[in-house]
Amino acid sequence: GKDLAQAACGAPSSGAGITLLFGGSHAGFSLDPMRSYYISTKALPKNDEITVNLTFSGTGALQTVPDTRGTPIRVHYSILEEPKADPAFVPRAADDRVGYFLETQKRLGDDAARTPFRRIIDRWDLTKGPIVFTMTSEVPRQYRAAVKRGILAWNAAFAKAGFPNAIRVDDPPSDPAFDADDITYNPIRWITQDRGSFAAATPHIADPLTGRILHATITIDGEVLRSLRRGFVDTVVAARVPAIAAQSPIANPALTSETFAAQIDPCLTGACEYSEGLVTDGAFAQLALNPRINENSAQTAKFIDEYLTATTMHEVGHALGLRHNFIAPDAYSLQEVENPNFTAKHGISASVMAYNPIDLAPLGKPQPNFFQTVLGPYDYFAIEYGYKPVSSSVDLTRIANRSTQHDLAFATDEDATGAWAIDPRVALFALSSDQIGWHAQRFQIADRLFATLDKRYPRDGRSYYDERMAFGTILNEYARSAMLTARWVGGAFTSRTH
């Protein structure tokens, strides 16, 4: 209609924020409106979807595009109907001891307050009914049960917070008019793409005035399952060592700016790379578990099933408003994460919101749970803070005060990366309170794999490509373990307690 046409007319006129993607020598790129155009538009009951092709040009042409005179970028805009005010929904104050995504508002009329900002958390309104996710027909039938388990696992935490059966998963609609782009649904989508390490993402949309979550989409990439079956990832995933970590905040105080850091560190922009790293870790685990990898074995099928459940649990946590918690693995001892009975009940970490690696047993010991497929104590704690009905801010503070318990501690993205990441316990893809001991076990597994690599490859008349990629998988594990172990030299413990 008219509103959609007016919105579309203005869409390609601005490349705000997109030029930052070029960075460095291409920072002078600007939008060329004469070579930008609309690809598609769609009007839905509560949202409009517009896809445009934006062409940027400037000095320092990119050599990786067909025509160096301009760089085309496809951009998708989603324009939502303004949510109606609901006086029954009470915004909930944020607390830096519990990890939620935030909405921040500046109070202009109170100069006596300690801070001009009011911070509230993103959360669903459960008083109107359950959160309903809709499985799309894109999700292969053989994987739907594993994905559904990962979503419904969160009901255990909501039940303790006073909302039993707070989440529901509907089967794919039979209505041919169903459109997964319609924000009245919260779809579970399945894609396949060329990047063999991307695995999942879960963006959500919240009302900036109240923090009420309006919509979420769970997107899972099926191509990563090929990487898990083979024991290597085609796309080499480098260890996450942001450029800022190599610079000194003393020499350049601007490096401590979260705004600056967000430009070079994707985790501070709300991005999640858990699934990407877990795929690489899963490929390493496949090499360690299967002397002769069989992509279609029963063990591989079980491995993939658990991977999908664990990944979905993590992504649904984001859909519920939760941020990462990278100190959660420190809650359990090395002996506990090696104990199959313990991990079956408590998991391998205190939270599914950590970047939990695969828990490989040392040689000669029984194998515990591979993945975090149960909620940890921090997950129950975080849902209690965000969703349990309370009568006053005192009740909220009382809940947050329990964060001093070891298994309820919280540390997130800005604590784990960059020049201020000084606490070695806050780590990505590490387990237990004895990280050095755990990484030593990983080095031993990698040594064993290197020693037998030539005996395993090539196989079945194939080329040496598989061996080269498997070599890269093992080498990546060496690099990651070495980097995380080195952080213990000169590190310092931090705390959010107050």
Please provide the spans of the model-predicted regions:
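Amphipathic alpha-helical segments that form well-ordered structural scaffolds
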Residues: 146, 150-157, 311-315, 477
